[in-house]
């Protein structure tokens, strides 16, 4: 069978398998690649190939993640699967593998377990927009009522974390049986649930908005003045497009100001516009060199606002990862590194949390001493004197 070439014509979506340990996430991932390979839409990846995921470093944090890719008739997917629970926590908090949607795997034989709950909570906090459920090991449950009970329990759990539990598609099957068969045919009892699952993923998980279609934002990395021309701010465009003559805002650190883009340049060439992913210099009208600094952002007016107080989910590095050796307590004052700059902040731990140990993930409220342009889902590092001791994500903005 000739290998299908990667067609850029289909929309690309990033998904991942989440759920409790041993409920079958990796087996399901292997079964999806095998079923799609039988249909000429993927390359089969065996369980062992996925399970022995290489370790990657993201912001100084070691995360083991397996990446597989496959297509359906309508989409191209990049799928992440993590071997260990801690890897999921780190992955979701750092955004190392951005998920546009998730497949929540729940063993029909066991029902929802502690990590099922924790992964749903994390998905909610880090802004995974949608999920589809696979009730795995359905072959081990011969009682129809028991299956319905587990499904009900999963729906209630999802609803309790503000996911639309009543509407989320749930597909029951056996990933192992599908993997053992591997024919990938619609009428096969073993493979049908995998095909049905992917149809639901295709239909239910929304296509992500591309970075280029979002409102313009560029974190300022450097500023210099060009005599006779004015002030230039340089950085990598995070999202959107900026054109010459656009009105933009300078947000964060101090009062928000408005200005007009009088030039865009890249590799010393003048352009009409810069777009997401480009490293550019932006020439700003009437802005003095001292009016703008690293840590601020240039943005489409009204699209982002500066804040000092927010709720966050954070993962605190272990000693082995180069983090702290000791726990921290309420009132901890590290630096929070947002995009290009460090800002001191004070941590208020969630009620009932006495302290946070290295290796924990924790919910906290942070009060920064200087305002930073932020949205929900913005990622940050927690640092002490330039050394990364944690990673986090803004889950809610307070003020």
UniProtKB/Swiss-Prot annotation:
Gene Ontology cellular-component terms listed: cytosol
Compartments, as annotated in UniProt: Cytoplasm
List of residues binding GTP: 19-26, 81-85, 136-139
Enzyme Commission (EC) number: 3.6.5.3
Region (G4): 136-139
Region (G1): 19-26
Protein's UniProt keywords contain Nucleotide-binding: yes
Keywords: Cytoplasm, Elongation factor, GTP-binding, Hydrolase, Magnesium, Metal-binding, Nucleotide-binding, Protein biosynthesis
Domain of life of the organism encoding this protein: Bacteria
Record-level Gene Ontology MF annotations: GTP binding; GTPase activity; translation elongation factor activity
Region called G5, residue ranges: 174-176
tr-type G domain span: 10-209
Ranges where the record places region G3: 81-84
UniProt enzyme class: hydrolase
Binding site for Mg(2+): 26
Catalytic activity, reaction form: GTP + H2O = GDP + phosphate + H(+)
Annotated stretches, region: G2: 60-64
NCBIfam families per UniProt: EF-Tu, PRK00049.1, PRK12735.1, PRK12736.1, small_GTP
Function: GTP hydrolase that promotes the GTP-dependent binding of aminoacyl-tRNA to the A-site of ribosomes during protein biosynthesis.
Complexes and interactors: Monomer.
Protein name, per record: Elongation factor Tu 2
Source organism of the structure: Syntrophotalea carbinolica (strain DSM 2380 / NBRC 103641 / GraBd1)
């Amino acid at each position: 069978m000739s290998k299908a070439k990667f067609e850029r014509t289909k929309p690309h979506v990033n998904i991942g398998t989440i759920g409790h340990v041993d409920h079958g996430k990796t087996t399901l991932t292997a079964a999806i690649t095998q079923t799609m390979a039988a249909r000429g839409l993927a390359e089969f990846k065996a369980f062992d190939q996925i399970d022995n995921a290489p370790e990657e470093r993201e912001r100084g944090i070691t995360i083991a993640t397996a990446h597989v890719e496959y297509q359906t008739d309508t989409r191209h997917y990049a799928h992440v699967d993590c071997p260990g629970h801690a890897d999921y926590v780190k992955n979701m908090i750092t955004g190392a593998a951005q998920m546009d949607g998730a497949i929540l795997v729940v063993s029909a034989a066991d029902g929802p377990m502690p990590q099922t709950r924790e992964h749903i909570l994390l998905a909610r906090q880090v802004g995974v927009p949608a999920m589809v459920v696979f009730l795995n090991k359905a072959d081990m449950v011969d009682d129809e009522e028991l299956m319905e009970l587990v499904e009900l329990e999963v729906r209630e759990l999802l609803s309790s974390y503000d996911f639309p539990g009543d509407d989320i598609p749930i597909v029951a099957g056996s990933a192992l049986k599908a993997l053992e068969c591997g024919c990938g045919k619609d009428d096969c009892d073993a493979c049908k649930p995998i095909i049905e699952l992917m149809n639901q993923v295709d239909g239910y998980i929304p296509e992500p908005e591309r970075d280029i279609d979002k409102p313009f934002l560029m974190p300022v990395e450097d500023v210099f003045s060009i005599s006779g021309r004015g002030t230039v701010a340089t950085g990598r465009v995070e999202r959107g497009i900026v054109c010459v003559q656009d009105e933009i805002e300078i947000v964060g650190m101090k009062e928000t100001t408005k200005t007009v883009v009088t030039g865009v340049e890249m590799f010393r060439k003048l352009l009409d516009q810069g777009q997401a992913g480009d490293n550019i210099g932006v020439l700003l009208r009437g802005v003095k060199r001292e009016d703008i600094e690293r840590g601020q952002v240039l943005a489409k007016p009204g699209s982002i606002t500066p804040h000092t107080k927010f709720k966050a989910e954070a993962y605190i590095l272990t000693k082995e990862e180069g983090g702290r050796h000791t726990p921290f307590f309420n009132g901890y004052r590290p630096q929070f590194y947002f995009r290009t700059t460090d800002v001191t902040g004070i941590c208020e731990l969630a009620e009932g949390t006495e302290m946070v140990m290295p290796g924990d993930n924790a919910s906290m409220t942070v009060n920064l001493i200087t305002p930073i342009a932020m949205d929900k889902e913005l990622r940050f590092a927690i640092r002490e004197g330039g050394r990364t001791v944690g990673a986090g994500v803004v889950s809610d903005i307070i003020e």
